[in-house]
């Protein structure tokens, strides 16, 4: 049976991290995706005791902290027109790689944003992003942590765009982390996109979407053809990681929701 990872924001919020990991385990998940957005940057300055609490919870529950979802670059993109924003983007990446290495996290999911939402994306924006990926790949290689660029709701939206970056950087430490929901919402040929780039993929983001709606679409109610996604990946030889992206939004039945999501996704896999 497949082991799915679950996004931290899908779980009920609690100061008791042992409870968080135990909840993930009881819901059937064996891997965990840590959220690192602009409001969680203080995690980079955790004490050894704080890091140990998370690692102990992971070991006790049997749920591995596998992926770091580095969404902070939405507010601090590498290709921004503003020098101070770009400087912060580099600082975040350097801290993320060091943090992931210390926590034993295998992959860092890199948000494919060239610029701030309020800025125009130019050729210089793209060039600056690629320069940053050269730098990031060097950091990742020295730390032994994989980087995977995620296709987003804007800027980097296709696997062709990611392929251009990955091939230009040409590092074994920088690959792709396709979000099949975003691919579908942008009306790309999901089967072709995945099959043609299978050797560059280090993780798959499982999320349902609708046209123009990139978040909070319950599994099975959107436009993503998950049976096609799984069959394409398996037939192409993919045996890697799958992360389930959801948001609990303080729902009283969030645990039941993530249980049912896992059950539903398993039903979409080749029998």
Task: List PLM regions with ranges.
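Transmembrane beta-strand segments of Gram-negative outer membrane beta-barrel proteins
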Residues: 1-4, 60-66
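Histidine-acidic metal/acid-base catalytic patches
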Residues: 1-5, 10-30, 156-178, 182-271
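Active-site acidic/histidine proton-transfer and metal-coordination neighborhood
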Residues: 18-19, 55-64, 76-175, 185-187
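Short, conserved active-site loops that position catalytic residues or coordinate cofactors/metal ions
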Residues: 27-38, 67-74, 111-112
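Conserved beta-strand positions in the central sheet of alpha/beta enzyme cores
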Residues: 33, 67, 109, 148, ...
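Glycine-rich, proline-tolerant flexible connector loops at the mouths of alpha/beta enzymes
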Residues: 35-58, 112-118, 214
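Conserved beta-strand edge residues that scaffold enzyme active sites
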Residues: 38, 72, 114-115, 154-155, ...
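Short, solvent-exposed loop/turn segments at secondary-structure boundaries
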Residues: 43-47, 78-84, 119-124, 188-189, ...
């Amino acid at each position: 049976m497949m082991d799915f990872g679950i996004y931290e924001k899908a779980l009920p919020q609690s100061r008791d991290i042992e409870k968080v990991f135990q909840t993930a385990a009881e819901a059937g998940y064996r891997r965990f995706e840590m959220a690192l957005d602009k409001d969680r940057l203080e995690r980079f300055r955790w004490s050894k005791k704080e890091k140990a609490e998370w690692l102990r919870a992971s070991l006790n529950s049997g749920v591995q902290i596998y992926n770091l979802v580095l969404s902070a670059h939405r507010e601090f993109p590498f290709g921004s027109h503003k020098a101070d924003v770009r400087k912060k983007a580099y600082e975040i990446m350097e801290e993320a790689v060091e943090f992931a290495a210390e926590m034993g996290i295998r992959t860092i999911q890199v948000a494919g944003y060239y610029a701030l939402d309020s800025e125009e994306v130019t050729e210089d924006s793209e060039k600056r992003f690629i320069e940053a990926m050269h730098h990031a790949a060097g950091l990742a290689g020295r730390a032994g942590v994989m980087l995977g660029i995620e296709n987003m709701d804007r800027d980097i939206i296709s696997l062709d765009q990611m392929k251009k970056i990955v091939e230009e950087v040409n590092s074994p430490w920088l690959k792709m982390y396709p979000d099949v929901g975003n691919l579908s919402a942008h009306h790309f040929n999901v089967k072709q996109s995945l099959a043609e780039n299978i050797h560059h993929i280090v993780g798959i983001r499982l999320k349902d979407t609708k046209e123009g709606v990139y978040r909070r679409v319950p599994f099975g109610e959107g436009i993503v053809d998950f049976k096609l996604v799984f069959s394409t990946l398996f037939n192409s030889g993919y045996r890697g990681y799958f992360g389930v992206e959801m948001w609990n939004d303080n729902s009283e039945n969030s645990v039941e929701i993530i249980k049912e999501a896992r059950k539903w996704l398993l039903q979409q896999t080749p029998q």
